[in-house]
């Protein structure tokens, strides 16, 4: 089984760049406090790096 990471949204999407909103949607995050589990891949890591100021990551 592939390694997974937990991603939690900690900040609002209001007033953010459209690209950042789309990245959050791509990660599956919808609201503050929402947590999703994603496979730990370079693509997902890149998405997290783009919106790192709005999310908390747990290994």
Curated annotation (Swiss-Prot):
Keywords, sorted A to Z = Ribonucleoprotein, Ribosomal protein
Subunit comment: Part of the 50S ribosomal subunit.
Q: Name one GO molecular function term.
A: structural constituent of ribosome
Give the family per the record.
Belongs to the universal ribosomal protein uL30 family.
Q: What is this protein's record name?
A: Large ribosomal subunit protein uL30
The record's annotation in CDD domains points to:
Ribosomal_L30
Domain of life from the UniProt record:
Bacteria
**UniProt cross-references to Gene3D superfamilies, sorted A to Z:** Ribosomal protein L30, ferredoxin-like fold domain
């Amino acid at each position: 089984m592939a390694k997974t990471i937990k991603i939690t949204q900690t900040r609002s999407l209001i007033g953010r760049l459209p690209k950042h909103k789309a990245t959050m949607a791509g990660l599956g995050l919808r609201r503050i406090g929402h947590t999703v589990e994603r496979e730990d891949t370079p693509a997902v890591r890149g998405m997290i790096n783009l919106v790192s100021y709005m999310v908390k990551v747990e290994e």
